Amino acid sequence: MAAEPVIVEAVRTPIGKRGGALANLHPAYLLGETYRELLGRTGIHADCVEQIVGGTVTHAGEQSMNPARNAWLTVGLPYETAATTVDCQCGSSQQASHMVANMVAAGVIDVGISCGVEAMSRVPLGSGSKHGPGKPWPDEWNVDLPNQFEAAERIARKRGLTRENVDSLGLISQERAAVAWAEERFKRETYAVQVPTTEEEQAAGQGMWRLVDHDEGLRDTTMEGLARLKPVMPTAIHTAGNSSQISDGACAIMWASKRMARALKLKPRARIVAQALVGSDPHFHLDGPIDATRAVLGKAGMSLRDIDLVEINEAFASVVLSWAQVFDQDLEKVNVNGGAIALGHPVGATGARLITTALHELERRDKEFALITMCAGGALATGTIIQRL
């Protein structure tokens, strides 16, 4: 039986930097506490949640063996709730959100959670793979799938982007994120995570635990400071100042049928207008958000003029600038509170984080439509248009 899936709540952790405040937390605990926060905000019993679909990129070590399920059990939630963890690379939790919404729409479940977690400090990207993803290629394969850095450089060359262009976006991201935190724009979408203190902090009388309530990746920088950063390769333009960060974090979104939301006295806050998972040219695979944007706009019968806010993941500055150049867009409504360059990119959690941020900002601005898109490893890209209700 068909039903209309709606978002009733969405919350994320602050994003921790590499080796930062969240680095001592097991990913199961990080996501598990996010589940508990989500349930606490809705006020419903955990028994109401029928299925969970989570996203993680590096399925190894502490993130192996279905972390979405492990996290649920780790914090003592009912074992009857089923969970699946998917791998769609950086698009994992965005695609997980599509999957949960689709299960609700199909009448398979009435209440579900989509989520994502990545503890990159503890489980480095690519862990468990000796040669890298899918390598060595069989001789008969003709695959030109560059690493992420080279992919970013390729689209920069294709679009004629300069070092100044990408540094400028890096600065904009930092400045917007700083303003967003100063104005408490992220306060509703985040919760304070309890973390163990260091020996030095305990010696200073801080106790055994402290609360982390802000994203850690923000930096006070300038164009001059960014220009001094060296790229990995002499001829390249991407540096640590105009690329996403290695991060730790989790995010969770609760979905329900409109009928069940009413029965549980939960406010429907948004719905999906259109969704897409697309394959893109492996040679230029970080241009995938361009293909995903065309796909969701086409499915929705909309144009970018109809979109109030855009969240496009800042994996590298060239991803956003290439997208903007192709669609002839300025950045006025793109990543209005900064992006992954400033906030961080806990890869498996970022898709859900982008949806969460877009929803809260639509509500804050009293706007209606947001487009969320991101590139993903393996020459994939995800796209979602949500409508605030």
Enumerate the language-model features and the residues they cover.
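Conserved beta-ketoacyl condensing-enzyme motif
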Residues: 23-111, 117-135, 190-212, 283, ...
